[in-house]
């Protein structure tokens, strides 16, 4: 009999065996790290462009919310593009902003926890700054004028209705205190606890811990129109329904055109213990319940009678059937498709090991998810109580099926289910088959980086050669990765990190992200503030067609004069773009100057036996930099190879001590996607050291003479410093720093003297 999670032989390389987590996990992790298959895992690409916070400010592509302050904890964002409003849930406050201009007349509603609750929270040993406050975790549009909101309330969750009054130019928030109610099973106690909720048809579905200690994990339905306002929740008597769950996301998705068959899908991770060992592992799950589930009649009263769950697998297939797993689900994003019943499911996963650190993005189809729920059930059997495939009789109607008169006129609600259906689903909530990525492996991975992926937003972009799903991935270090995965002609995928953006002034974990495709903006919330980031900044790629084409950014194209936003409906004929291959030679006219004839020649003088540095930095971190030199009297260029005297760095070429034979023309070239161009052309002239030393007495004499003009004196001082024996770069910089400081002090003293003279003139 097969164990739950174990595949048939045909799928053995794609699925994982339950019970692999044992005391040998440490050695297994190390083995997996060194046996990772070649492919998109180990050959990870660098971000093509890396921009810091100052770079984003300079390019005007980031706008920080000026009304925020340190420790505000912006982890709840509600974007309503239809009504043009942006609500932020923070510590003790709710903000109402205009998404067109987040700093234009922002409105702030104060909603702190009561003093008694704060004192009790502190007495319970919680942190008064980061825990004992009202952190807003729930913001859902209830109708056109009201928002349902919940906060942690200093470990005493509280919910209420907020009303948005006024018009767009003069709106404000009003808290209806008479609607305040307990937020238990609607909102977490702990502000740092993962949590998921969705409000649809006036019902609130929430996955959270329902107790102070955070042990009782439950998925609950509450609110609703009268008289259907009773709680429906998961069964806590059996820990194999949800065991120490951490909820990530919840979404209403229709399975068929029959509204009675509509379901709520929610994603979470939980602790899983196999019966053969006491070790606990973390597994990611997708679960679903019917929206018309009202609980059982005699059993499972006020509890879900259609609850089913299946494992989400995100792994890299390895040799001998040993896969590298990313088991901790961090975030989920549903990318809509033409068929609203079949969105693409994007998930961010991380590893559970502290030795092997990694993150991955896997994509799933609703077809595969539904196939798992329509497949065999799992069953605990044997002395070790392992989950195995259930091969017995399945009662009618099939457990997990939504009640509908279309299927059976005798079953109108879940209270009409036979007792054997209720008993079966109570003991068999887990499906036997796991859900695997549509590509069989992650579409994007990060291994042993200083950060981990925590958030994901996906935007579908129309380009010249097709449509692309551009991913914006938030990290726990405050950066956002802009990534596109391209499928080539041979069906192999290529991951491209277009940009790495440091969106916060002070790096901190990204807590939430929302995208506005209408405004082409990304709203990013963190512990200390919120920023608005543009989805594209085409002008930073360069001033030529080739540079714009090499960027491979679906948002950008060459319009004949500059790199600008690509608009599919544009009537411009000179749109140049190649996302799939990034080959400017077939799209641009400025690709023939490989020898750099059009690059401006710079002249540089160096002194024999001194060092010289030729700076050359490519805008692209993915480009291969190569150096060439054309010596006098030689008719062809020679590539420079590093040795003990010549060093090639990421910033340029360093010649540690110059020789007479180093004179010549130096070329810095950049090669990217089989396209080569010249970035720098320097003509290096070597000055004879003996001649420089012969002029040193004259230089000293002229430098001591105050009658010598300042420009001439500074130029001679430069020559004097360059001619010094084996002067290091630090010594050179220190000398220049002292000289500039002395000149500033001299100028400042001269200015003070002039002021005193002018004052004396006034008094006399």
From Swiss-Prot:
Subcellular location: Secreted
Region (Disordered): 743-764
Predominant localisation class: secreted
Paired cysteines (S-S): 121-132, 150-159, 290-402, 314-362, 538-556, 668-733
Gene Ontology terms for molecular function: chemorepellent activity; neuropilin binding; semaphorin receptor binding
Gene Ontology cellular-component terms listed: extracellular space; plasma membrane
Glycosylation sites: 143, 490, 610
CDD domains: Ig_Sema3 (cd05871), Sema_3D (cd11252)
Ig-like C2-type domain ranges (all copies): 661-740
PROSITE patterns (alphabetical): SEMA (PS51004)
Signal peptide from the UniProt entry: 1-41
Domain Sema: 48-535
Record's keyword terms, sorted: Developmental protein, Differentiation, Disulfide bond, Glycoprotein, Immunoglobulin domain, Neurogenesis, Secreted, Signal
Domain of life according to the entry: Eukaryota
InterPro entries tied to this protein: Ig-like_dom_sf (IPR036179), Ig-like_fold (IPR013783), PSI (IPR016201), Sema3D_Sema (IPR042582), Semap_dom (IPR001627), Semap_dom_sf (IPR036352), Semaphorin (IPR027231), WD40/YVTN_repeat-like_dom_sf (IPR015943)
Tagged with keyword Ribosomal protein: no
Function, in words: May play a role in the guidance of several axon pathways.
Family: Belongs to the semaphorin family.
Protein name: Semaphorin-3D
Organism of derivation: Danio rerio
Protein encoded by which gene: sema3d
